[in-house]
Regions:
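Beta1/beta-strand and adjacent pyrophosphate-binding region of the FAD-binding site
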Residues: 1-11
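N-terminal FAD cofactor-binding segment of flavoenzymes
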Residues: 17-79, 372-383
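A short alpha-helix-loop-beta-strand transition element characteristic
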Residues: 59-63, 67, 75-88, 148-157, ...
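Feature captures the FAD/FMN-dependent oxidoreductase FAD-binding
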Residues: 69-143
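Predominantly flavin-linked oxidoreductase catalytic cores and closely associated redox partners
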Residues: 109-284, 288-289
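A glycine-rich dinucleotide-binding beta-alpha-beta segment and adjacent secondary-structure elements
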Residues: 275-341, 348-350, 368-385, 391-395, ...
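C-terminal auxiliary extensions adjacent to catalytic cores
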Residues: 391-440
Length: 440
């Protein structure tokens, strides 16, 4: 049995690994290093193009639950993330290069996976999982459009945040802490007074943007919105978003500042930090000018400026089923952000499910029923739900799972913990069936 996987991002690598672990021969196509997209900086697989944070690692948060489900089902991406994690409070952040290099090493060393470099411009014959990502090349995008019909692809834009060196941060104007002192004090917090914020906001909202073809409609994904776009929504919008000071007391004053810019470690050495929530598409000189107005960053050395790029995704409901298979041709499945899931872990989960179910189909087995009560199942059911009127990329959340059916005392966190406990119970019940066909 043989399957072609197109794309060695998080979804494609997870899919290739799960297929290979089940004794299936995998040909993995990756256009790097021969060709790169504007968002790529390295030749390794599973490159984290935006943030190095995989978001919350607490099961009371839906993405934390999704991580735990994948861990229990032997996910490659989660194993590599856990092995390369860096301190980030209650979140799971990874050494960006270390994570990508480990995934690459695992994939390249698997005896059932053959990596073929170069661009794919047509959908191959046979069984295929297309995980070419939101920056799918024009040639392959045209082939996909021809296969599924015009009008089934949509676009939005997202952006990446800048990186600065730790040694260039003025720690006399910053302090280490995690919000509400939760976990370890892993974030560098850069406080701003009301006057400093006012000057920063004025500069940010009037700064010159880089030209991005097709961006005139300002169609951005809310979870990756450029900081300058968010700032224009209102004077204090940032203070309720990425610059919110709640739970962060400046040790110099004992008070919460007017606004706080947080920096998160980007590598294991702690030599590089990213500006949390500062996705942007300002021109590079403007990024240097405006972001240097943050007191702790007045002499910051920017090792990478923020960039913005177009993302492509499918109008999946009515086209894909809950297992990410093309309804019109079930030898083809899709995975990753192009299916309409948003986020690193969500992408890996889609690759996991697409591969597990393709392997079972090739073995003549019936699909494993991941119910809506699980995060993995809920995502598949969301992207295939034809009742969704305005389909847009979405992160996993408890809102796409059914309610408990009974009242829980103790607030939202306790309720979410109960939802997570229910989900993990379902996963544990499915684990034997999911892993039974592995040939390791």
């Amino acid at each position: 049995m043989q399957v072609t996987v197109i794309g060695a991002g998080l979804a494609g690598c997870e899919a290739a690994w799960q297929l290979a672990q089940r004794g299936i021969s995998v040909t993995l196509h990756e256009m790097k290093p021969e060709k790169r997209t504007p968002a790529h900086h390295a030749d390794s697989f599973a490159e984290l193009c935006c943030s190095n944070s995989l978001r919350s690692d607490q099961i009371e948060n839906a993405v934390g639950l999704l991580k735990e489900e994948l861990r229990r089902l032997d996910s490659l991406i989660m194993a590599c993330a856990d092995a390369t994690r860096v301190e980030a409070g209650g979140a799971l952040a990874v050494d960006r290069e270390g994570f990508s290099n480990l995934v690459t090493q695992k994939i390249r060393s698997h005896p059932n996976i053959t990596v073929v470099p170069g661009e794919v411009s047509a959908i191959p014959e046979g069984n295929v999982i297309i995980a070419s990502g939101p920056l799918t090349s024009d040639a392959l995008a045209a082939a996909i459009a021809e296969k599924i019909g015009d009008g089934h692809t949509l676009n939005f834009f997202d952006a990446a945040a800048p990186l600065v060196t730790f040694e260039s941060v003025n720690m006399d104007s910053a302090f280490f802490a995690s919000r509400y002192d939760k976990g370890t004090p892993d974030y560098i917090n850069c406080p701003m007074s009301e006057e400093e914020y006012e000057a920063f906001w004025q500069a940010l909202t009037t700064a010159e943007e880089a030209e991005v073809h097709g961006f005139e409609d300002k169609h951005v994904f809310e979870g990756c919105m450029p900081v300058e776009v968010m700032a224009r929504r209102g004077h204090d919008t940032l203070c309720y978003g990425p610059l919110k000071p709640r739970g962060l007391r400046d040790p110099k004053t004992g008070q919460e500042p007017y606004a706080v810019v947080q920096l998160r470690r980007d590598n294991a050495q702690g030599s590089v930090y990213n500006l949390v929530g500062f996705q942007t598409h300002l021109r590079f000189p403007e990024q240097k000018r405006v972001f240097s107005m943050i007191p702790a960053l007045k002499n910051a050395d920017f090792v990478r400026y923020g960039v913005m790029h177009r993302n492509t995704y499918l109008r999946s409901p009515g086209m894909l089923d809950r297992y990410y298979r093309l309804i019109a041709d079930d030898r083809i499945a899709f995975a990753g952000q192009m299916t309409g899931v948003e986020g690193y872990i969500e992408s890996a989960a889609s690759g996991f499910l697409a591969a597990v179910e393709m392997a079972r189909r090739l073995e003549g087995e019936t699909p494993v029923d991941f119910p809506r009560e699980t995060a993995i199942g809920a995502l598949g059911l969301y992207i295939s739900d034809t009742t969704v009127s305005d389909f847009q990329p979405m992160n996993v959340n408890f809102g796409i799972m059914p309610p408990l059916g009974y009242r829980v005392r103790g607030g939202k966190r306790v309720k979410n913990a109960a939802l997570a406990e229910r989900a993990l119970g379902r996963i544990d019940a499915l684990r034997e069936a999911v892993l039974s066909d592995r040939k390791e």
